[in-house]
């Protein structure tokens, strides 16, 4: 117990019952899963994703641990670097038709069946999660249909042609295009990234997939070096009411999914640095500020919320893939462990479940 901690239990015993916590860092997903199968951890939820569930479920009895599959608040989503230092890429990534093409080029049903075992829901990214009642359900399915024909037509319109006959499209300026898909398994499952990369290659967009550490990913993302951002995003209404980050460049903090870094510079410097964002970005900033100061449940509040979602969804700065459950792991010797309602950072993971009252029985 910690004598300086501010909570005691109902009998007056000082909390927490467990006086020390050690965290083992295992970046490689296979190593991480092996450690869990061998019961080398007492609790784990962060970085666990549904594609790893079968091996964890299969070894529960042998490892004397329990897996609960709980719904996620966030969802896998992808962004393009609309302020890329490569001006040829910046022009293409900033073209809404390109982002529309990349959205409909994804076979979300197949991704759900293969990577999520049919347990997820193909869905567009709305920023809000779960979807509030004042937001039209139609936005959840906006541009998520699998339509490679439409993707090819849009890419043709932009002027992205295969000029050298290698099966992949060049940029409109004639330069070769390779989209570097760096990802961390803390943010998105490798199977999802590989399948999305394959889908894009099928409409002539060459990709290179590489797994990196979370630190490498975040550093590259915040220094405007990524071609593509890939992480999990989404917040409940209650959080959005006090936190505007999903609607203001760069659309999340250092540890989340950021895009439009030079737009953020422009906004933060009042236009003295960075790149001026499009009008819809400024509109979103104005709307979230008014939304947060408007009476909850009023007609104006709901009008603003719907408009924010429409603006977010139709501009596809973050493109949703699939939302599904994820594993929560605990060793059976860890007692007072109640089943989580959600798998989420947004509710501070263990905080609602009184982790201070967990104890060991062994």
Language model: regions and residue ranges:
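A short alpha-helix/helix-coil micro-patch that ends at or immediately precedes a cysteine
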Residues: 37, 196-203
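Loop/turn elements at helix/coil->beta-strand transitions in domains of secreted/extracellular proteins
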Residues: 19, 40-42, 62-65, 95-99, ...
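Aromatic-rich, solvent-exposed beta-strand/loop patch
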Residues: 1-31, 57-75, 117, 159-164, ...
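Short, hydrophobic alpha-helical packing/hinge segments within bilobed ligand-binding/sensory domains
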Residues: 32-33, 98-99, 217-221
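Short, well-structured beta-strand/strand-turn elements
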Residues: 44-46, 161-165, 201-216
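Extracellular/periplasmic solute-recognition and catalytic clefts
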Residues: 24-86, 109-114, 228, 232-234, ...
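Primarily short, surface-exposed interaction patches in extracytoplasmic proteins
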Residues: 45, 89-94
């Amino acid at each position: 117990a910690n004598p300086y901690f501010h909570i005691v239990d109902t009998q007056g015993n000082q909390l927490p019952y467990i006086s020390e916590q050690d965290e083992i860092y295992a970046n490689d997903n296979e190593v991480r899963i092996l450690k869990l199968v061998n019961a080398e951890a007492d609790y784990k939820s962060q970085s666990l994703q549904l594609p790893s569930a079968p091996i964890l479920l299969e070894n529960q009895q042998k490892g004397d641990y329990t897996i609960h599959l709980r719904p996620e608040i966030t969802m896998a989503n992808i962004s393009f670097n609309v302020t890329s230092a490569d001006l040829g890429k910046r022009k293409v990534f900033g073209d809404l038709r390109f982002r529309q093409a990349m959205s409909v080029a994804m076979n979300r049903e197949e991704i759900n069946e293969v990577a999520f075992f049919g347990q997820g829901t193909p869905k567009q990214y709305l920023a809000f999660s779960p979807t509030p009642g004042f937001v039209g359900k139609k936005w959840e399915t906006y541009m998520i249909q699998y339509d490679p024909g439409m993707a090819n037509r849009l890419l043709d319109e932009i002027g992205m042609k295969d000029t050298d006959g290698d099966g992949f499209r060049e940029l409109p300026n004639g330069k070769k295009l390779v989209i570097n898909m760096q990802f961390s398994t803390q943010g998105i499952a490798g199977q999802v990234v590989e399948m999305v990369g394959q889908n894009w290659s099928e409409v002539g967009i060459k990709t290179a997939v590489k797994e990196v550490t979370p630190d490498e990913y975040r550093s590259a993302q915040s220094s405007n070096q990524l071609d593509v951002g890939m992480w999990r995003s989404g917040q409940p209404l209650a959080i959005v009411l006090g936190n505007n980050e999903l609607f203001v460049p760069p659309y999340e903090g250092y540890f989340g999914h950021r895009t439009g870094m030079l737009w953020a510079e422009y906004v933060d410097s009042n236009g003295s640095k960075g790149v001026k964002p499009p009008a819809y970005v400024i509109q979103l900033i104005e709307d979230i500020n008014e939304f947060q100061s408007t009476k909850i449940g009023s007609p104006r509040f709901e009008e603003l919320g719907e408009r924010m979602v429409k603006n977010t969804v139709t501009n596809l700065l973050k493109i949703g893939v699939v939302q599904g459950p994820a594993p929560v792991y605990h060793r059976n010797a860890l007692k007072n462990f109640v089943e989580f309602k959600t798998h989420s950072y947004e509710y501070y993971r263990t905080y609602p479940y009184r982790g201070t009252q967990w104890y060991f029985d062994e």
